[in-house]
Amino acid sequence: RRGKSAVIENGHIVVLGWSEQVFTIIPQLFIAENGLKNKKIVLLGDRDKVEMEDQIRNRIGSDALRRVVCRSGSPIEMSDLELTNLNEASGILVLTPEGDNPDAEVVKTVLAITKNHQRKSDPYKIIAALKENQNRELGKIVGNGEVEWIFSGQVIARLLAQSCNQPGLSVVYSELLDFTGDEIYFIEDSKLIGRTYREALSSFQKGVVIGLQKAEKVTLNPVMETILRPGDQLVVIASDEQGLIRGERGAVRDEWIASNHAVSKASESVIILGWSERGNELLVELNNYFPPKSKVCIVTDKFDLRQELEDVSSSLKNLKVSFEKKSILDRNELESLKLQKYDHVILLSNDDRTLTIQQIDSNTLFTLLHIRNIVEQGKAKLSIATEILDGRNSRLAEVAKADDFIVSDRLISLMMAQIVSDRRRNAVYEDLFNPQGSEIYLKPACEYIKTGVAVNFYTILEAAARKNETAIGYRLSSLSEDAKRSFGVVINPDKREEVVFTEQDRIIVLAEK
């Protein structure tokens, strides 16, 4: 029977499940470093083998099938799992299924793997995602140390919350998570033992130091005077493991370092258009990131949220939440919202079980085009963060000039591919998306260096270090609409190269909130 014979591969990657994630994860694994490049991928899905192969051929290319072996079966059936030779696999990715209760299916799949009587005695290396943060403890119990969990609902909510007042942040994360860009690596450098973290920052001409791993604990942007001890590892951003290039430290021009300090806004105002299961999580994250007395207005005609919002509002100390029941597809109703009085717009993909993913994205893009036109006509200055479900529609979001667009499944798929390559990366991502500790910020260049003069990145590193921050790159406003130039985002620049910054440009840093 086609797709029902056991595979004989070993050292392979097993992908369990069939969804849109397949078309992001497989190409990423093809170009991954850390020895994954030439490994076979065994895919177990609940579709006909030929159907899966045809879709892979059409969406990824014929060459993909030289490395992908498809098998038909259910990831929760132990007999079907045995087709994939799990005991010899170097990594296992559990995809999030479509349906009403995906977390339950993911948990059952993990149990089918770990409780199989034919399992190996050594721990598996499993990467899986749970949508609901309330299932975090259950995941830890079921995973029993064998699973690297991604809590996808919380990750997307946090990125939307962070992006809405930091245009370009989603591009920074895409650069860090996509194997076509620079990635996160861990290195031990005996030459830096006894030196400080601050000294380590400028030790490489190419390659950005972002943190330290001490005794299995990762700390991003640690105290600048932290001493490196034997066994400590640097957490770095580099093109690959050989991408760290030493060089003589370039001159730091003290006279070009600015002493300006940011003036925090007293409060923020955001309007959320659309609503989904991650809406409450988004409110929690906005409450974490926004100052007291900030305002949030939620607009949708799909649900009456008044009672639900009353219940959740008591725990939101920094937010005053209001609700309007209006259609976000109706131009007149959008204009009646007076968008110009808000600082930020978040466009959420509506939960609507009667629509396909493509139909939901079409509605989102339709609303986005209206918003952009209304904003331009009113000459309002506000940021727009948009959630897209299918990555193939991201090009359309670019045309509609979304400041940030977050493709939910693609982002989680990129994270899964990165973690199966090196599971230590998950600790870095958890730290980055945690409201406590250091996060990524895009701050005005004029807060660090004088604009209108040529400065190298060594000078920017020093300027950031004086604020107890770690600089990792910059964003040029003149390229903010150029997709081919990563919308102006440059991560891990050559530190010797000099750049002339303007008042509109941003320095990308790791900093405390």
Where are these regions (language model features)?
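Cytosolic regulatory regions of ion transport systems
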Residues: 1-513
